[in-house]
A protein has these predicted regions:
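C-terminal accessory regions
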Residues: 468-518, 811, 816-847
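Conserved helicase NTPase motor core
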Residues: 100-194, 420-427, 433-437, 606, ...
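ATPase/helicase motor core of nucleic-acid motors
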Residues: 17-28, 38, 43-44, 205-329, ...
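Basic/charged alpha-beta structural segments of nucleotide/phosphate-handling enzymes
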Residues: 9-144, 153-154, 158, 278-324
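Accessory C-terminal helicase-associated subdomains
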Residues: 144-148, 304-424, 606-685
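Conserved motor-region signature of P-loop NTPase helicases/translocases
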Residues: 2-29, 143-259, 431, 898
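Conserved helicase core region in the C-terminal RecA-like lobe
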Residues: 5-9, 31-35, 148-152, 212-218, ...
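RecB-family 4Fe-4S metal-dependent nuclease core
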Residues: 543-899
Length: 899
């Protein structure tokens, strides 16, 4: 039996079978953990392996009992779990160095740590090594011809050294010292980006032919690219990974805090396979649309069918089981903090859900790894939480952050034909003729583990027989280990890159050292941006330019919406292709993963605030507004924000929210004054009108505010959160399809004889009413239309244009004609005095051409801003394709073919 040991080795370390004459049987490569398990197995010593969260809980329990009156007391009050974790790391390093709680050292810090360690329930790994050493003094577990081959002796912790010394009495323990020097036969292949380097490597260039082993520390992206290129994958692990499943722990518990973090709620609902079940997607969709939790949220829950079929084929109602993971949404924790019992209930349910998933035959191995960790997080929190009472959101967050840690999970396994890959140069057990170091960047040295000790404490420990290396000695040993490992290599190929995801990478110390040693011929050894060894396919690229017309299938010609809206009518007239794709085929770009932007959110909140005011105060809203107590206003505004703009409650928007509330209060006060000045009474807000228009047919209008004057005539106000000129310009040019159709809808909604006194846009940020129907006054801007605009009968134009486009659709043809001279388009030529059509909008870059949607292009990496143009010339594009900032496209959903 031969055991090969180094703290740096693991089961995937490189062994040269030819050098060892094929003696794989009876050979075992071990790191410290594997060696401990092997020795305990041979001795029959049974030691319960504690997970990291379990060890943390035990340490926290001992610390909480012993922290009073110590130097750690105040910091422990601030962050119990975080401090416990840090002190646990310190004691781990001390214990492995040979320190014990009984070591006599005149240091307050070390005496406190000793007291804490004595109170920890469970056996530390250092104690397990010490127990082994004691056992080996009187027991033999190896035969004389067994060999233990030890590498990197300088890095072996003291407690393990003691065990190895004892093993030397019953087996052959050889300490390997590498002969030779670091390789002089090397090349450096330098690339701009990691992707370029990986593509070159996977293309199997001549430079890496006959490579014995590849060193690569992060193979996840490498494997993704290998799959894309049809190459076999290698063993890979997601290092320091935060998979979505583990986020259930952090995100779920963050939902108990108030104000509610709506971004966290959206992320929680979008985690695949989350415990909320199928309703989560629908809730995420309504949350993204509404901007907060309101009656639409509850409507989804009430109407959702929670019936599920179990493994036996039985159907069961899972409503209660699923909704228990949203129980915090119905609680208000503002006043007295969060009930510990609620936290416990949620955490216990989440742990129980993990257990059920682990028992399911449909759960794959990768997910099981994550479920085990998630369950351990939950149970650790349950042990740390108080038995009952309340807990603040800050303390809960500290507990969660202290317990949660990124993990390492299996990503992919090596496939047949994959190269031999190790994660570090220190994992070369034997000599290798040719090695490729893929990703020789940055400084991967271990962090000095004794930074918490001062010089005097180190000296006192050494006087007690415990060797603590100084920082300089520690890093010197690390560097020496690197050089020793390189002696195993004859020919070396180093692959480096300058950027990884736009982040500039540091130079590896080895590159720095080699550059210094070989400065005379360094230029000959470095190859920059080597082209990948890929076959070149030649062919004509067919560019899909915007078309003049499109043919529709027979099925599409019969498609018709249940009801139209002003936005669908506008799209049909201006961009019939978009209408067909968006409204008939219902193909939209996915937007469920994001909440509305800030300006849209403010508009939603403003609408809801006015709606709540009208609902509460009715016709007296305008007269009463300035007399409403500030507390009542604040409560109504808070409700509006919670229901429609919860993102404003996030800490990062605190100042923005304060400014917004002030502007909204002032703006609604101005709106109330305008209503009184015009002698109007609010009738209703957010009025849904489903009517049948003469030409268009079924039509749905959502009117922001309907008012009435003393004559009983109706007035429409439409609210906008905008500071631009778009809406005033629509009125000036007599192009407001929205207000024109709303007038017709209102007449039908309120019955025959209904008269319209006027319509207007109210822009909240500008605190101004824009109208053509009411006279100029404070905060009322009367817009004068040019004579030719005022003479146009807008409703006739809209109806005629609708009929024109509908006839096109019925015939199976769409005339898009984007970026075509407007005067040459058939639609324009059909515009006559007898049958006027609504005018087409020109492109914002070209006044005479019909408008076209644009796709915004992200600035490519490494392209300077001044070289990135919005409207480059044809010559500029041919010279440098990267200068394009926007691309014209028939429809945004087709942008995948363009960018």
């Amino acid at each position: 039996m031969t055991i090969i040991y180094s703290p740096e080795f693991n089961s995937t370390s490189y062994i040269n079978l030819e050098q060892r004459q094929g003696q794989l049987l009876g050979l075992k490569v071990c790191g410290s953990t594997e060696l401990l398990s092997e020795l305990e197995l041979r001795t029959g010593i049974i030691a319960l392996e504690q997970s990291e969260p379990e060890r943390l809980v035990a340490f926290h329990e001992s610390l909480s009992k012993n922290v009073k009156g110590t130097i750690f007391e105040e910091s422990f009050k601030t962050d119990e779990v975080g401090v416990a974790r840090q002190l646990m790391v310190w004691t781990d390093n001390l214990l492995m160095a040979g320190w014990t709680p009984d070591t006599k050292v005149d240091s307050d810090k070390l005496m406190v740590l000793a007291k804490i360690v004595k109170g920890v329930v469970g056996k530390h790994v250092a104690q397990r090594w010490q127990d082994l050493t004691t056992y080996l003094k009187s027991h033999t577990i190896f035969q004389k011809d067994d060999v233990i081959e030890v590498h990197t002796e300088e890095l072996i912790p003291a407690v393990i050294k003691s065990t190895l010394e004892q093993l030397a009495h019953q087996a052959t323990v050889n300490y390997v010292v590498h002969e030779g020097q670091i390789p002089t036969d090397f090349k450096v292949f330098h690339f701009k980006t990691r992707d370029n380097a990986y593509q070159w490597y996977l293309s199997q260039p001549d430079a890496i032919n006959n490579v014995d082993v590849t060193i690569s520390s992060d193979n996840c992206i490498l494997n993704d690219m290998a799959i894309a290129m049809g190459k076999p994958t290698v063993n890979s692990k997601s290092q320091n990974s935060n998979p979505q499943l583990l986020q259930l722990f952090k995100l779920g518990l963050s939902l108990f805090a108030r104000p509610l973090n709506v971004n966290h709620l959206l992320s929680y609902l979008l985690i695949p396979g989350n415990p909320v079940g199928g309703v989560s997607y629908k809730l995420a969709k309504v949350l993204a649309k509404e901007g907060g939790v309101n009656e639409e949220w509850q409507k989804v829950i009430d109407e959702f069918d929670f019936t599920e079929t179990n493994e036996k084929g039985e159907k069961k109602d899972k409503r209660q089981e699923r909704l228990q993971f949203l129980m915090m949404m119905k609680k208000d924790y503002y006043a007295e903090g969060i009930l510990v019992s609620d936290i416990r209930t949620y955490t216990e349910n989440l742990a129980h859900w993990c257990d059920k998933q682990l028992r399911s035959p449909f759960t794959d191995d990768e997910r099981k790894e994550q479920l085990v960790v998630l369950a351990s997080f939950c149970r650790s929190l349950l042990l740390i939480l108080p038995a009952d009472g309340n807990i603040s959101s800050e303390l809960l967050q500290n507990h969660v952050d202290g317990i949660y840690r990124p993990q390492t999970f299996t990503h992919m396994k090596a496939q047949k034909g994959a190269p031999d890959v190790v994660s570090s140069i220190t994992q070369l057990v034997d000599k290798a003729e040719k090695v490729c170091w893929l990703g020789c960047i940055g400084d991967s040295s271990a962090v000095y583990p004794f930074d918490f000790l001062n010089t005097k404490e180190i000296e006192k420990l050494q006087q007690s027989g415990i060797t603590i290396p100084s920082k300089s000695v520690f890093y010197s040993k690390q560097h020496q280990m690197l050089l020793e490992s390189l002696k195993n290599v004859h020919q070396l190929v180093l692959v480096t890159w300058e950027f990884d995801s736009n982040a500039r990478q540091e130079e590896h110390p080895l590159i720095t050292e080699l550059k210094h040693q070989h400065h005379d011929d360094w230029g000959k050894r470095v190859i920059n941006d080597e082209k990948p060894n890929l076959p070149i396919k030649k062919g004509n690229i067919i560019k899909l330019d915007p078309q003049t017309t499109y043919q529709l299938s027979d099925k599409m010609t019969s498609l018709k919406r249940e009801n139209e809206s002003y936005s669908s009518i506008t799209t049909m007239i201006q961009h019939p292709f978009d209408y067909a794709v968006n409204y008939l085929l219902k193909l939209h770009e996915p937007q469920i993963g994001q909440l509305p932007d800030l300006d849209t959110t403010k508009g939603l909140v403003a609408h809801r605030f006015v709606e709540l005011l009208v609902k509460k105060y009715g016709e007296q809203m305008a007269e009463d507004y300035d007399r409403i107590p500030q507390e009542q206003k604040s409560n109504l505004m808070a409700d509006a924000i919670q229901q429609k703009g919860a993102v404003l409650l996030l800490p990062e928007y605190k100042l923005e929210c304060q400014q917004f509330k002030s502007i909204l209060d002032d703006s609604v006060s101005v709106l109330a004054d305008i209503i009184q000045k015009l002698q109007l009474k609010p009738l209703d807000s957010e009025v849904e009108m489903n009517v049948n228009l003469d030409v268009i047919g079924e039509f749905k209008a959502e009117v922001d505010l309907v008012l009435r004057n003393p004559k009983g005539e109706y007035v429409i106000f439409d609210f906008k959160w905008s500071e631009g000129k778009t809406y005033p310009n629509k009125l000036e040019e007599n192009k407001s399809i929205q207000l024109e159709l709303y007038k017709e809808a209102l007449k039908l909604h309120y019955g025959a004889g209904s008269k319209i006194a006027g319509v207007a846009y109210y822009l909240f940020p500008k605190m101004t009413l824009f109208t053509v129907d009411f006279p100029e006054s404070d905060h009322i801007h009367h817009i004068e239309q040019k004579e030719e605009n005022g003479k146009r009968v807008l409703l006739d134009e809209i109806n005629n244009s609708y009929v024109y486009r509908r006839n096109e659709l019925n015939k199976g043809m769409i005339e898009e004609s984007e970026m075509t001279e407007i005067s040459e388009i058939a639609y324009t030529k059909a515009d006559t005095a007898d049958d006027p059509l609504f005018p087409l909008e020109p492109d914002y870059n070209h006044d005479t051409l019909k408008g076209c949607p644009y796709v915004k292009v992200d600035k490519p990496p490494f392209v300077k801003k001044d070289g990135w143009k919005k409207n480059p010339t044809t010559n500029e594009i041919q010279a440098n394709p990267e200068v394009i900032k926007e691309i014209k496209t028939t429809h945004p959903i087709l942008k995948g073919r363009l960018v």
